[in-house]
A protein has these predicted regions:
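Flexible, glycine/small-residue-enriched loop-and-beta-strand segment within the central core
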Residues: 1-79, 113-114
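Contiguous hydrophobic segments
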Residues: 5, 18, 38, 92-102, ...
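Short amphipathic alpha-helical patches
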Residues: 34, 52-55, 89, 126, ...
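Active-site/pore-lining binding-face segments in mid-to-C-terminal subdomains
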Residues: 67-118
Length: 141
């Protein structure tokens, strides 16, 4: 199941879901080119001692006003908090805290307590109040 809230902008994305998994994308989220959401894992993994199948399929949750940079990869179990930003080509299957900037493979938080705006970069803008888009203020946790 895929839930996409209002005012979500998706440049291009691939969403792979099977069975009972859910991908949820919160309102006012921006998803850049070639982003992949993958709940499904194609092959089975087993515990070597018990020979029992390991649980693999979990939901993916993206909060409100999240910015996913180009070619991000969200795997089963990923949870991205409100107002967070994932840098280009970042990958995660874990939790990224709200209002944080995460980059890398695997993604790690490099900055907390951020707000982002859809306005293009302009060196004259010194605060969020200089921007037309101030939606990030609504999602501070």
């Amino acid at each position: 199941t895929i839930f996409i809230a209002d005012n979500v902008k998706i440049i291009s994305a691939e969403i792979i879901v099977s069975g009972a998994q859910t991908v949820t994308i919160g309102e006012e989220t921006l998803i850049a080119r070639n982003t992949i959401f993958r709940c499904e894992i194609s092959h089975l993994l087993f515990d070597a001692k018990t020979k029992q199948v390991l649980p693999q399929k979990k939901d993916i949750f993206v909060g409100k006003h999240v910015w996913l940079g180009e070619e991000c990869y969200l795997l089963s179990g990923a949870k991205i908090g409100n107002g967070a930003v994932m840098g280009a080509r970042s990958l995660t299957s874990s939790t990224i805290k709200a209002n944080s900037l995460a980059v890398g493979t695997p993604a790690s938080v490099i900055r907390e307590n951020i707000i982002w705006s859809r306005n293009n970069f302009d060196s004259k803008k010194k605060t969020i109040y200089d921007c037309i888009d101030q939606d990030g203020l609504k999602y501070l946790d």
